[in-house]
Amino acid sequence: MVKLADITEIIPIPEDVTVTINGSEVTVKGNGGEIKRNFNHNKITISNDEENVTVKVAFPNKKDKAMVGTIRSHISNMIYGVDHGFTYKMKIVYAHFPMTVKVQGKIVTIDNFLGERSPRKAKIIGDDVKVSVKGEDVTITGINKEHVGQTMANIEQATKIKGRDPRIFQDGIYLVDKRQEELE
């Protein structure tokens, strides 16, 4: 099979976003804030001009091809995050025992889940992630897609019921809407 000479992925940069590349570290600044990430892969080169970020690899094998696409997606998510932000909405569902959810610093505390006496806790990942609770709605917002998604997963996993049929015992906090919205 013929080997490709190189693979190049080009990511456009919006006008109000600046991308700085220092070696393998990519810094993206925008209206929402700043995200830094290190992409330390030997064969892959990342460069930019005023309008585009270019991810390139010469004579790639299968893993290098996949890594170029992965890095392109990460940089695209960073650009979108500082420009627009990410919002995940969750719903508190209970049948008999009313659970209360509170945000205390970097911890989400879930009290009275299935009548349990000890509270369940979920960690908020990242400094830029904000969790708000209004009634039965939990909203998670931030500029880093990975931190927002992991915080959402931590909250959902904290209310996972073990040893019972989840079709019958549907109590928990579940993802309702994933949205990429404009920053306020």
From Swiss-Prot:
A single cellular component GO annotation: cytosolic large ribosomal subunit
Q: Tell me, what does this protein do in biology? A: This protein binds to the 23S rRNA, and is important in its secondary structure. It is located near the subunit interface in the base of the L7/L12 stalk, and near the tRNA binding site of the peptidyltransferase center.
PROSITE patterns to which the protein is assigned, alphabetical: RIBOSOMAL_L6_2
* Pfam families cross-referenced by the UniProt entry: Ribosomal_L6 (PF00347)
Query: How would you summarize the oligomeric state and partners of this protein?
Result: Part of the 50S ribosomal subunit.
Q: Which Gene3D superfamilies match?
A: Ribosomal protein L6, alpha-beta domain (3.90.930.12)
**Similarity annotation:** Belongs to the universal ribosomal protein uL6 family.
> Molecular function terms in GO for this entry?
rRNA binding; structural constituent of ribosome
Q: What is this protein called?
A: Large ribosomal subunit protein uL6
Q: Name one GO biological process term.
A: cytoplasmic translation
UniProt keywords (A-Z) are: Ribonucleoprotein, Ribosomal protein, RNA-binding, rRNA-binding
- NCBIfam families named in the record: PRK05518.1, uL6_arch
